A protein has these predicted regions:
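C-terminal regulatory or interaction extensions
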Residues: 1-68
Length: 68
């Protein structure tokens, strides 16, 4: 079952468009990096709903996230 956080994240993303972490946080009106990663981003990645553009470097400053 999807959490409300993951649903909100997916609602602000369009398919096949890469987003930065900051862009997604801005769309959601969030300020906490840790809260965003813990509640929104990591659960969506674990469920294979969002993918990283550079999976071998999860902490890359050039990392983008794509709705799949």
């Amino acid at each position: 079952m999807l959490s409300e956080y993951v649903k909100k994240l997916l609602d602000v993303m369009e398919y096949d468009i890469p987003y930065t972490r900051l862009a997604l946080m801005e769309k959601l009106g969030l300020k906490s990096n840790e809260g965003f990663r813990r509640n929104y981003l990591h659960p969506a990645i674990e469920l294979n709903l969002v993918s990283m553009t550079i999976p071998e470097k999860p902490n890359s400053r050039n990392q983008r996230y794509i709705k799949v």
